[in-house]
Amino acid sequence: MATTNDLKNGMTLDIDGVLWNVVGFQHVKPGKGGAFVRTTLKNVLTGKVVDRTFNAGVKVDVATVDRREMTYLYRDGADFVFMDSESYDQIPIPPDVVGGTADYMLENTVATVALHDGAPLYVELPASVELTISQTDPGVQGDRSTGGTKPATLETGATINVPLFITSGEKVKVDTRDGRYLGRVTS
């Protein structure tokens, strides 16, 4: 148990049996009336984001979430198999838990897996990863009708927009949070 005054970004709360991550919070002390805390919460399972207001000092349940470093090994049917870096246990994780991070995972990718009561909640990759462009159309000199970008397919199968000068076979850095091209990787 903690109070709303102890909230921090990244905390996981158990509200009515549903797990929520604190994305943002603000303590508000109006001139009239009691203080309160405005929070932005993200549902751990569905990803839905809601705004919720708590009175200051109200007790909230903080869920115990174990964050472990794991290595993605392979796909087994629909499941993704991860290996715990400490215990070397192999854990199958369903695709709905892995979510959109699968677009940026290759074998032997190190990720952080959040577990609650031994069950995986979500998989978190580093902020950026380096991947190879498997297919993209050649950029035509002077073609600026598309804003200077073109679609490219990564080695994982995901599609991102890259600048016109990028060619197939090049390594690029990609933001795993929104799928943006960050830059070319130089050897």
Curated annotation (Swiss-Prot):
The keyword Magnesium is assigned to this record: no
Any single Pfam family the record assigns to this protein: EFP_N
Domain of life: Bacteria
Annotated protein name in UniProt: Elongation factor P
Pathway: Protein biosynthesis; polypeptide chain elongation
UniProt keyword Transmembrane helix, yes or no: no
Encoding gene, per UniProt annotation: efp
Lineage: Bacteria, Bacillati, Actinomycetota, Actinomycetes, Frankiales
InterPro entries cross-referenced by the UniProt entry: Elong-fact-P_C (IPR015365), NA-bd_OB-fold (IPR012340), Rib_uL2_dom2 (IPR014722), Transl_elong_fac_P/YeiP (IPR020599), Transl_elong_KOW-like (IPR013185), Transl_elong_P/YeiP_cen (IPR001059), Transl_elong_P/YeiP_CS (IPR013852), Transl_elongation_fac_P (IPR011768)
HAMAP family according to UniProt: EF_P
SMART domains linked: EFP (SM01185), Elong-fact-P_C (SM00841)
Keywords associated with the record: Cytoplasm, Elongation factor, Protein biosynthesis
GO BP, sorted A to Z: peptide biosynthetic process
NCBIfam families: efp, PRK00529.1
